[in-house]
Amino acid sequence: MLNLTVGAPANGGSCVARHDGRVVFVRYALPGEVVVARVTEERGSHWHAEAVEILEASPDRIESLCPIAGADGSGCCDLAFATPASARRLKGDVVANQLERLGGHQWAGEAEEVGSTGATGWRTRVRLDVATEGAQAGHAGFHRYHSSDLVTELSCAQVPEGMLSGLDGAKWPPGAQLHVALDEAGARHVVQTGPRSDRKASTQVVEGSYEATQRVGDRTWSVPVTAFWQAHRDAARTYSALVKGWAKLTPGMTAWDLYGGAGVFAAVLAESVGESGHVLSVDTSRGSARAARAALADLDWVDVLTESVRRALGTQRRRADVAVLDPPRTGAGREVIDLLAAAGVPRIIHIGCEAASFARDVGLYRGHGYAVEELRVFDSFPLTHHVECVAVLSLA
């Protein structure tokens, strides 16, 4: 055990402390606190640890809002012990640091609240794993932090009341996964996938249907429970409105919706460019692409392509006036951003759910002559260290 004085927040949910000249990344602690920490991993010049006792607490510390999270619990809500307002400030500090170090861009601010749900009960989609061995075998649960071990109590504070009711008492095939979604009306849909047998994973609807209906604006989507949809109940509406305003499209223009999922952004882009324009939505997920084609079937000027973004960009002959990107946590990366720059796309809206990846992508754009016009950070995952960053960039 180590007695540590905790310093500034780091990306990934830890704060930085020092012990005998070595950097220690401490989870479940806040800046300024003095804690007793248990070392969980040693990596030469730095260690990872978790606070197990608070000797001097920050005024921002509260009793955890999540009953199952913490050093000896689930890894679900790793900031549930901080006031929501202080957590938003902390997340803003982390994003600012990553942008300066990795993106060469100066920004100051804090994460903004999304919608009016508050810090708890905001999640609409959950994936649970089923334990394969021991006393927990056959029971569904959340993973402990960076562990294959599961916490089979399902009272995570992110989850609305009743969303997981009854699932903890049931027995499931070991190694399976449960996908749970709430639709627009609040009805629950549960789909079991796996376990894998002879390289194939079975899919079974346990409750409700295979697709959950979601609504953004005047349009409805039927999205597979196993496919991607924004986790926060108000996120899709928030980002959609922002993209529409920042795109500054006019009738007849062309827009690319890259990593487009079910086509939520394609819908608002299509409204702006009208029948004389063109929108291309690209995603590798067949389920998401099917949902996009169904939801946008009345918009003849929208094409939905099931393909990698890299390959799709290599085949386009018509330059986009605006490109919207919402890549996975790893970011868009150099190859995709090089292709966008080579295509001469004058305006780009980039969305990222991991601060370091987002900052690196911003740096890549800047290397091609793009400048950040505006940047906002959203607290789209309350009680956790995760954020959603959105930037609009234009060729200088």
What are these regions (language model features)?
Residues 1-325, 330-338, 344:
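Accessory RNA-recognition modules of RNA-modification enzymes
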